[in-house]
Amino acid sequence: MSSMTLFILFVSIIALLFLFINLIFAPHNPKNWTGKSINWVKLSNSGKTLKLLILSINRKVNCGWSNYSGIVISQKIYESIIGNRGSKSALLSVKEQRVYGSCTNNLVLRCTLVGLEISYQAKIPSNSINFKRNFSTLESKLNPSYISGFVDGEGSFMLTIIKDNKYKLGWRVVCRFVISLHKKDLSLLNKIKEFFDVGNVFLMTKDSAQYRVESLKGLDLIINHFDKYPLITKKQADYKLFKMAHNLIKNKSHLTKEGLLELVAIKAVINNGLNNDLSIAFPGINTILRPDTSLPQILNPFWLSGFVDAEGCFSVVVFKSKTSKLGEAVKLSFILTQSNRDEYLIKSLIEYLGCGNTSLDPRGTIDFKVTNFSSIKDIIVPFFIKYPLKGNKNLDFTDFCEVVRLMENKSHLTKEGLDQIKKIRNRMNTNRK
């Protein structure tokens, strides 16, 4: 045997020996991590393959960590089908991240990371969740029925008639579709603009913003939407009048005396009616009757989600209580307030949701309220997880869910838990900056 052959054989034996030692003692073998390394024991819940794994590179704002390297994978599954895999939580839906075992150079990542999601804090039945939606990593476009529900609460169909000597008849006539919100909901207004792909968003004051459409072509698109996805509050009458006015302007009828008078007659019964200037300028105007509206019926849950984003409230109240050991107790409420002209619609929510009650206010409004804790936990919270809010109010809902979780765990009966609830309450609704 030549010296070269002996050398190759020797090198091969050394290489095999080194590989064997490396497999036994190297840091990537969890059974032998000691000292400054993590003393790794195989997790009791490791075993079956994961239901879904995706790279977690782009995270939502609510996420508890950033994964710039892309070596962390995400898993979303339900507690009912989770088997031995994942974190056992009292909550239904858990957002979980695991690390590929091949990432041996970063020992810090050799653990299970659990982060916050909007739906994380709510304990709800598995069949109440939209399973497919949980796997989406992209912000979906607004649902058309959500848009109609939101506009039923916050939208305005405006007919403006202004004195203007530039026009032959001395009056300028414009139709506008407008949604005005606090600037905290600027992102929602931009989503609505993106949905319609017409109009503009303006910052009106330091605290308010507005989405506005007034071009004839743009209003055609707006009208097409609401013809297909109708309003169901009494606002549908204003919409029908608005549509009549828009058609007159499209046909240039506003440039004739007869057409202008017809538009003034519409203006007299839409929204707040004629202002003082118009009442003086057109004293003998023959007004028209407001259109009849169909009996309201909630056919799409996304409509209710949009309507609640506009008009709903998630309330946490801490009040004095003689029966509580701490001297204080917590009351949760889900509230929807509307003009009593929509009394039939608001009362129909009791049957639609299967909970709550209504009360008329002397000031001309009607309230729908859910205060029963079980109804809030088992009906209200699951509904808005499945049909999520899209505006700033979703932050209030997330906080509301956290309080529900604390109360379900009886934390409100301890001083620490009650203090935590007070802290959450103090950042909600009008206190949110």
UniProtKB/Swiss-Prot annotation:
It is found in: Mitochondrion. Its main location: mitochondrion. It comes from Podospora anserina (strain S / ATCC MYA-4624 / DSM 980 / FGSC 10383). Pfam families: LAGLIDADG_1. GO terms for cellular component: mitochondrion. InterPro entries: Homing_endonucl, LAGLIDADG_dom, LAGLIDADG_Endonuclease. This is Uncharacterized 49.1 kDa protein in ND3 intron. SUPFAM superfamilies: Homing endonucleases. Gene3D superfamilies: Homing endonucleases. It comes from the Eukaryota. Keywords: Mitochondrion. Coiled coil: none annotated. GO terms for molecular function: endonuclease activity.
